[in-house]
């Protein structure tokens, strides 16, 4: 016998799916939208209770969408299937924000870079290095994660960075990485990596425009600091 509470076990006028059909998705709360996707609760919690507690326990949607599958499955009521559903939803959300309707994204200021990558990077538990490849009009043509782990100049090799830019016919690049501590203050290694990549870019003919360090809702631009 299946003891899991399902959406259909709720009164019809309280079912998120029915409310979505009748009133539109925009009127549903975050918990209701998550409930529509997860569909079933547990033997002790209906799906609305589970969705609400999941968002609360992880600290909100931003934090929920940056959990790993291991972290999600440690939460009571979340098995592998539900964890995978959440991760898939998270990735779709990030891709939509990054590639919104296929619109071109032009970089004019460091804030433009921050707006592009902040949601994806601000709560990461490990350091991640992204490369943004730009054309001659400073429009982002490609974004890729090139490294995950503690950054230092002996590990981050210019070859890996500029190889992507050459493949994609990039005119220039911007690199971004996060500090899991939430403090984006550049370390000595951050500065060394930046200067090394700047020099390599000059030799290759692909300019490093900036190195943005992401913290918790704040960032530091190496260009604004005068490092490059």
From Swiss-Prot:
It comes from Clostridium botulinum (strain Hall / ATCC 3502 / NCTC 13319 / Type A). GO terms for molecular function: metal ion binding; metallopeptidase activity. Keywords: Hydrolase, Metal-binding, Metalloprotease, Protease, Zinc. Belongs to the UPF0758 family. Zn(2+) binds at residues 177, 179, 190. PANTHER family: DNA REPAIR PROTEIN RADC (PTHR30471), UPF0758 PROTEIN YEES-RELATED (PTHR30471:SF3). CDD domains: MPN_DUF2466. A motif (JAMM motif) lies at residues 177-190. Pfam families: RadC (PF04002), UPF0758_N (PF20582). The lineage of its organism: Bacteria, Bacillati, Bacillota, Clostridia, Eubacteriales. GO terms for biological process: proteolysis. Residues 106-228 form the MPN domain. This is UPF0758 protein CBO3003/CLC_2900.
């Amino acid at each position: 016998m299946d003891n899991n509470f399902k959406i259909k076990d709720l009164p019809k006028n309280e079912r998120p799916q029915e409310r979505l059909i009748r009133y539109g998705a925009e009127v549903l709360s975050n918990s209701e939208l998550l409930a529509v996707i997860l569909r079933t609760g547990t033997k002790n919690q209906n799906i609305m209770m589970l969705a609400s507690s999941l968002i609360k326990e992880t600290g909100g949607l931003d934090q929920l969408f940056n959990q790993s599958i291991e972290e999600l499955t440690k939460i009571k009521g979340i098995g592998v299937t539900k964890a995978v559903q959440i991760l898939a939803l998270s990735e779709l959300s990030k891709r939509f924000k990054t590639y919104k309707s296929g619109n071109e994204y032009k970089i004019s200021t460091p804030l433009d870079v921050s707006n592009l990558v902040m949601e994806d990077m601000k709560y990461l538990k490990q350091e991640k290095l992204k490369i943004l490849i730009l054309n001659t009009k400073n429009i982002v043509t490609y974004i890729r994660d090139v490294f995950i782990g503690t950054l230092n100049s002996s590990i981050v090799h210019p070859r890996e960075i500029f190889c992507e830019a050459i493949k994609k016919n990039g005119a220039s690049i911007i690199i971004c990485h996060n500090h899991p501590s939430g403090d984006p203050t550049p370390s000595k290694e951050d500065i060394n990596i930046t200067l090394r990549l700047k020099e390599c870019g000059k030799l290759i003919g692909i300019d490093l425009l900036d190195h943005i360090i992401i913290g918790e809702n704040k960032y530091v631009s190496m260009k604004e600091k005068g490092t490059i």
